Amino acid sequence: VANDISNTPPQMSGRILKAPEGNLPADLPDQARKARRNFMGRALAMGAGAAVAVNAGVASAATAPPGDGDPAILVLPEHSKGLGQPVAMEGGYGKPSKWEKNIQRRESPGLTRVPQSSVSFCPLQSLFGIITPSGLHFERHHQGWWDVDPSQHRLMVNGMVKAPRVFTMDDLMRLPSVSRIHFIECGANSAMEWSQPAVPSVQYTHGMLSCSEFTGVRLSTLLDLCGADTRAGRYVLAEGADGSSMTRTIAMENALDDVIVAWGMNGEMLRPQNGYPLRLVVPGVQGVSWVKYLRRIEVGDQPWFTKDEEIHYIDLMPDGRHRQFTSVQECKSVITTPSGAQTLLDKGFYNVTGLAWSGRGAIKRVDVSADGGRNWRSARLEGPVLNKALTRFNIDWVWDGSPAVLQSRAMDSTGYVQPKINQLRAVRGTKSIYHNNAIQSWRVAENGEVSNVQMY
């Protein structure tokens, strides 16, 4: 069957030429600086977002499968004949292999005026499972990152509480702790795809996304210790200690549910780029509410309507009005392999893999299409399938060499189904920046090149 999505892989698998790291074309920076300056400028004025069309890069030729007489098998390599490196090299902290040095989080040229207020994108196309290595976790800073002295860091809890308190890091880390796996996604993930395909690879279309195990104390525990009025106090304000004065309103319902005041990430202390020594973890909610360098929690009876809730992180509607406090990251998925800027070198079997997530619960099903959405088959969900965490999916695909369009469509535990881009635009228009959870399409050409397209 042509381009068959199946459950039984054939014996011989096709090969994929990986997307070259940093594969934005050489002439993109000048284009991007102009287009994205307009994009960001109009965004601040609640205008339309500009996009830059680019061509997917093509990497160098791949190595052919080994055959009879392969010297890699017949000639004994150096690592099989002598002593290797001693223990505790590289300063006592493990590093990736030198052969993987190109797998990096990367900036997008011209996205912002200064790198301290910018984004680095996670290389989703190069990752396995659901946990993002801490060193590849995407970054979003509003005024750069800091390496804060934990002995001098304090967390204040005040407002509508009986006993306002100031906690040191030692105070917090002596309290009962929990560890939970959750995804974090910037509300602007996929922002440049609202009007047309704008960037070539999944690193840039969906790379403001990561998933980690976070460790800390429940916010509800701190509120209880301080005697918070959780009836009249319907909201909490989270305030960060960096120069951007990031402040976000969080509903008390969320605060009492699964919000964590975290110091740990993936089994170690938070990295400075991720808010060391303390950050808020608000599962299912856009990343801006996961306030880094957390220094204050205030309980109040109404939202604070801060600058990052009235000017930024709002949804512009087609009639010119905007929606506020639309913080939940809706059900979404993306195929990471095969994906944009990769190249299929052979006909035959491929494992189509990707990620799905929802801010409202767990992923229940992911369907995959190889013909642009005309026919769908259910993918395998790889465990664990957790609430408000990434879920890895896989499905077998036989490519016959003809053009194909790969798509994934997720459904979460509430029954919500990920929409097509035209369905989303019918409600939201094309002038939005945030909360684009549309189905992503990857076109596979006859020559095997994979590119970013939109299907209506």
Feature-to-residue mapping (PLM):
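General helical structural elements
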Residues: A19-G22, R37-G41, M46, N102, ...
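Detector for intrinsically disordered, low-structure N-terminal pre-sequences
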Residues: R15, A51-A53, G57, L74, ...
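N-terminal export signals
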Residues: A32, N38-T63
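Structured, non-membrane catalytic/scaffold regions adjacent to prosthetic-group chemistry
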Residues: A64-Y456
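N-terminal secretory signal peptides
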Residues: V1-N38, S60-A62
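A ubiquitous, low-specificity "background" feature that marks scattered single residues
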Residues: D27-P29, R33, L44, V148, ...
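Generic alpha-helix initiation/capping and coil-helix boundary signal
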Residues: P25-L28, G41, G49, G401
